[in-house]
Amino acid sequence: MKKTSKKSVQNYENNEIIKQEINLQFHWYLASFFVIFFGSLIIPAIILMVYVMLFYLPSFLETKSFILLFTQLKPFLASLFMPLIIILCYLIHIFIVGLITRWFWRITERKSPSKTGIIPRNIPSKTLNYYHIRSFMIKYPKNAVIRGPFPWLINFLYNFVGTNKIGKGTTIEEQFGADKFVDIGKNSYIGVNSGFSSHAVEGIFGNIAYAKIKLGDNVTTAALNCLAPGVEINDNSSLFPLAGATKYSTLKGDNYYYGVPLRKIFKKKVSHYAGITEEQLNEADSLFNKSSAKEENKQGE
């Protein structure tokens, strides 16, 4: 017994976690934010000021007669193009935000790639530091898009920066979380205030469980759905409101799910929740099967 205990102690000492000293501190957070925020405003600000000073100011603001604003062509064009210029500047701003964030994101991925596993918090860790930097870095770009006039550009932002992979035809409503390490297939709908968290802190000072969340094609999360790290939902799945999945849950798909933790819902409960008959539900299923068969035939041709 003593020999085995000594061997186990030696194995534990040999397999202990290697401590990694790092130099990255809060100045990287501030630097990334200021570069992304102010760097993305330079070109749009120049375009807007040039338009205002050279065209809008002399053609519209300096017009002495109020009647001339509606009777002459120049004041009319100046006022007409002003909203378009503002929209153009906003789109350029969003593109540059994504471009700078993508550049920073790729640097951090080269230093410490994102991967599934447990990130310790009780020792200095390069993985932990870059995880926090990436989490902070994506916050402003995400909110600048999803709370702006064109929230559907969030798909472009995620794919362009490389934080998430979003398929074609997928709609993402305003949500919390879900800004990194998420893979969503085609023609899916992510409902309002759905929370996809690819990380979970195990207690106040515990380790961080970090794992990719994967959703297949034609997946619907109605609203207020929470998915934990490592959740995998296969094709043709529909989640009822307030349904949630615990860590590393896997759903086979082709069904409706409800509750916490997620579980299948049968046709009687579906008709009860939706207020429809089973015949109407069967008709909807047949229409869906026909449309999916047509799409498969088109792709085959």
Where is each model-derived feature located?
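Membrane-proximal soluble helical/coiled-coil segments
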Residues: 130-232, 236
